[in-house]
Amino acid sequence: MNTGNDGGREAVAFVCAHPDDLCGCAGLAFRLADLGKYDLHVIDFTHGERGLGEAAYLDGSCRAKRIKEEEAACAMLGAHLHWLDEIDGDSYARPETCAKLAALLSQIRPRAAIAHWPIDCHADHSMSAAAFQRAMQLSRVFPEVYFMEQVHQSRHFHADRYVDITTTAERKYALLGLYVCQSGDQIAAERRIAEMYHGRKIGVEFAEAYADWPLTMAPGRCLLDEII
């Protein structure tokens, strides 16, 4: 797989703990894809192997299903897909995983990255955020970082900005429906309610919430402001 940028376009990375965590940022991803000047990379910390229970984890059937579903979602987005191979429910910011992610950042050199809120109540989310922070330090690649909201899992989330996804919301919900083994249609229904609520805050139909990491922001340079 080509891990570099296509045609000199700026790269944007989406660092997710599991397949289906694009539920927090797919509306933004589609907006970037529509502009045609960004190279999108989805980096999954785990394969979501335990998403159907222990038996489906042990026989590998859940992993296989979730890989296919994520491949379909990334194809819909036109995004490159990368795996870090941590284990769902038993993930850590291990040195080898941080080094693997650092090497990937060095190849991709993203302009911006979307990551999990570091104190999400789901441990896999917080571990992926910790690995991403260490990978930036190891690679010396420091993109603009924005944290996505995972609704009930993002405790004490403070939104610094809302991205209008009115033009991409229906495609986002169709993408979430691809996660059949995780009841993707139900995820889409939950996100629709949350994003209608956020949209009302800024006078649009649907919006996603993001928090900035100020330490990674260059003065006068903000990807999310540029696409408004």
What name fits each language-model region?
Residues G27-R31, E69-A72, E96, K100-A103, ...:
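Alpha-helical elements of Rossmann-like donor-binding domains used by nucleotide-donor carbohydrate transfer enzymes
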Residues M1-I108, Q137-V141, E226:
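Active-site rim/loop-helix segments in enzyme catalytic domains that contact anionic ligands
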Residues M1-N5, E69, M76-L77, F142-I228:
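The feature marks non-catalytic terminal segments
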Residues A17, W117-P118, Q150:
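Histidine-centered beta-alpha loop that forms part of the nucleotide-sugar donor binding/catalytic region
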Residues A93-R94, D124-M127, F157-D160:
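A short secondary-structure junction signal
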Residues K100-E144:
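Active-site adenylate/phosphate-handling loop in enzymes that bind or generate adenylated species
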Residues L22, E49-L52, G89, P118-H125, ...:
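Active-site environment of divalent metal-dependent phosphoester hydrolases
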Residues C62-K65, A123, T166:
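Active-site metal-coordination segments of metallo-dependent hydrolases
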